[in-house]
Amino acid sequence: MQSWRQQLNLFLIAMGFFTRIPMPKWVEVDAEKLNQASRYFGLVGTLIGVLSALVYSVMLHWVSPSIAIIFAMIASVLLTGGFHEDGLADTADGLGGGWTVEAKLQIMKDSRLGSYGALALVLCLLLKWQLLSELALFDPSSVSLALILGHTLSRVVAASFIFSEQYVSDDASSKSKPLAMQQSINELSILLATAAISLLLISFMQALVLILGLLSVRIALAWWFNKQIGGYTGDTLGATQQIAEVVCYLLLLIVGASW
């Protein structure tokens, strides 16, 4: 087992990759360590979820839950620099506008926002806000828990693609290129353990619904991306995170209303 300092180094790499939080200067970064850092992508999601939930809880003292949710969403975007939202938009533009695999991948690399990407972004943000606002009607405090679970579990789902799917982008300058190295069972185990620990925050039946629902989404997206482009790219990982986050809020709303 690697030392705690090595593990901390990997976590800080993951944090630096997925957020705008600066890494300490002593952190050692290379392609191999970035690939190993994928084990902590879920934990970085927990950090983002906790900070977003903190913003929500503070704002709740002065504004309504629906407005506090907007501030929490803004906080998460500022923390990540819209990293995953950008991936969602690029994926929507590529898969919506390209007729061949090559064209789809080329469109994804284009930094300009197209109509498909704009629609995907607007719909995704509206869905997040509406689902969390509906959750707040049952219990305003449940939104904080939803934010933590949503940000954690969605990143676990996205990062798990590295273990089983084929990386297809040939762009050497891509920020996610080092992730193309296949994830080891050790990385996947720690990733899944993070998800399991976060699920202890809710009841067994609620956790079971989330597991089955997110597993179904993961299988469906893997099938769709393989059919469309033959594997995954950094952009489709971002799209997966955003879709899984929305589904997580939807499932929490369903089970919250049922149990």
Swiss-Prot record:
Q: Which GO terms describe its cellular component?
A: plasma membrane
Q: In which pathway does it act?
A: Cofactor biosynthesis; adenosylcobalamin biosynthesis; adenosylcobalamin from cob(II)yrinate a,c-diamide: step 7/7
Q: What is its EC number?
A: 2.7.8.26
Name a biological process GO annotation. cobalamin biosynthetic process
Assign the protein's first listed, main location to one coarse class.
Answer: membrane
Membrane topology, record value? Multi-pass membrane protein
Q: What is the annotated role of this protein in its UniProt record?
A: Joins adenosylcobinamide-GDP and alpha-ribazole to generate adenosylcobalamin (Ado-cobalamin). Also synthesizes adenosylcobalamin 5'-phosphate from adenosylcobinamide-GDP and alpha-ribazole 5'-phosphate.
PANTHER family in the cross-refs: ADENOSYLCOBINAMIDE-GDP RIBAZOLETRANSFERASE
Identification of the protein by name:
Adenosylcobinamide-GDP ribazoletransferase
Source organism (scientific name)? Shewanella piezotolerans (strain WP3 / JCM 13877)
